[in-house]
């Protein structure tokens, strides 16, 4: 996840006469030397050896990719594409995630509401038997035997790309045809739930997909629902949540621990030694609708990253916290957005590390590896519903 707003452009900023490859590589050099969190550990490479600025950037940051600190977190994009993704999670696709179960069967692991897959009533756990790429159906085994690529199987990210799916559910087999279209990822999978238990207040359950702007009003309604039901125990399902906006993470932290940590640092942002003046400590604030849970269980996988890990790390000093699933991805850093003036280019660059209010961070190989969290190991059984 990146910052809630683009950072200042690097100084000095010069208007560019052109947006050619050479100027883009110079832009990368100017920004990375000033802002990159580990600027002193960059590879010594020659810009002239690279045909495009992205490959040059990846060559520069290669030493940080090897040890897992920056495995592709820094990249070039366009301002329009970046803003669309962070505001609504917009992309072009069929609207499903997939995985393989313990018998290596291909199954849908998540189906987005309002997507082509959702409109076709496909569901998590449905088994895909075969896919029609342009003509006859080919079984998953046949596609694997001929080493069909993901791009070939699912097609380009273009509106109108069509694929057929032969699907099995509870012994019944049916076929659907899906056409890709532009989608906005729903922040929640379904609605927040109240899980009843005899003689006790209910448990609140939320499956949270992404820290995007569209989530903000939904999180307020979630908090109101749980507060009105006297919820003190929460299950927050972040198994596929790869992060997003810090502003949304702040909102969620304030809902969970704004009252408990009032006046304390919620989390801290630490930059390189050239940019220590940018370091900030963000304090907890009490929102209009707050929860003060006693216990929280976070469902996590290696797909749980960035803002998701920040929230878990920051709330843990205030609430009894347990992780359920497997270790998280390990994205303890954030990017800023740098725009090349006069061009469409935007550089998303790792520029800061996130720490909780007690100064704890460094979860580059996952939260569990820090030794500060209890993990209840559990497999993500994609044959079953989320809850």
Can you annotate each of these PLM segments?
Residues 1-3:
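N-terminal Sec signal peptide cleavage junction
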Residues 6-234, 248:
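Flexible, low-complexity junctional segments that flank or bridge functional domains
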Residues 199-206, 213-233, 241-387:
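C-terminal "post-core" interaction segments
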């Amino acid at each position: 996840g990146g910052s809630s707003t683009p950072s200042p452009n690097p100084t000095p900023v010069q208007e560019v006469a052109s947006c050619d490859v050479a100027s883009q590589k110079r832009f990368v050099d100017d920004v990375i030397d000033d802002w990159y969190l580990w600027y002193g550990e960059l590879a010594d490479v020659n810009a002239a050896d690279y045909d495009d600025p992205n490959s040059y950037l990846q060559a520069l940051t290669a030493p940080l990719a090897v040890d897992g600190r920056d495995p592709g977190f820094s990249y070039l994009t366009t301002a329009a594409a970046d803003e669309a993704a962070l505001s609504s999670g917009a992309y072009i696709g069929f609207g499903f995630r997939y995985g393989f179960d313990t018998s290596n069967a291909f199954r849908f692991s998540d189906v987005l509401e309002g997507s082509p897959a959702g409109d076709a009533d496909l569901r998590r756990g449905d088994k895909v038997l075969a896919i029609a790429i342009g003509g006859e159906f080919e079984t998953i085994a046949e596609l694997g035997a001929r080493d069909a690529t993901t791009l070939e199987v699912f097609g380009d990210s273009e509106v109108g790309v069509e694929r057929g799916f032969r699907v099995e559910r509870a012994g019944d087999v049916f076929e659907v045809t899906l056409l890709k279209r532009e989608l906005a990822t729903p922040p929640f999978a379904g609605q927040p739930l109240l899980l009843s238990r005899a003689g006790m207040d209910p448990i609140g359950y939320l499956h949270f997909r992404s820290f995007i702007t569209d989530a903000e009003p939904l999180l307020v309604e979630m908090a109101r629902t749980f507060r009105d039901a006297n919820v003190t125990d929460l299950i927050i399902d972040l198994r596929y949540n790869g992060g997003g906006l810090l502003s949304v993470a702040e909102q969620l932290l304030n809902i969970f621990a704004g009252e408990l940590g009032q006046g304390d640092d919620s989390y801290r942002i630490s930059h390189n030694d050239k940019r220590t003046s940018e370091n900030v400590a963000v304090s907890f604030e009490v929102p209009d609708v707050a929860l003060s849970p006693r216990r929280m269980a976070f469902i996590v996988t290696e797909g749980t990253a960035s803002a998701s890990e920040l929230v878990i790390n920051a709330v843990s000093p205030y609430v009894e916290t347990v992780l359920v699933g497997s270790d998280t991805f390990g994205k303890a850093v954030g990017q800023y957005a740098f725009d090349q003036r006069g061009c469409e280019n935007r550089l998303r660059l790792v520029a800061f590390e996130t720490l909780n209010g007690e100064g704890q961070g460094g979860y580059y190989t996952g939260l569990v590896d820090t030794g500060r969290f209890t993990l209840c190991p559990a497999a993500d059984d994609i044959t079953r519903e989320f809850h």
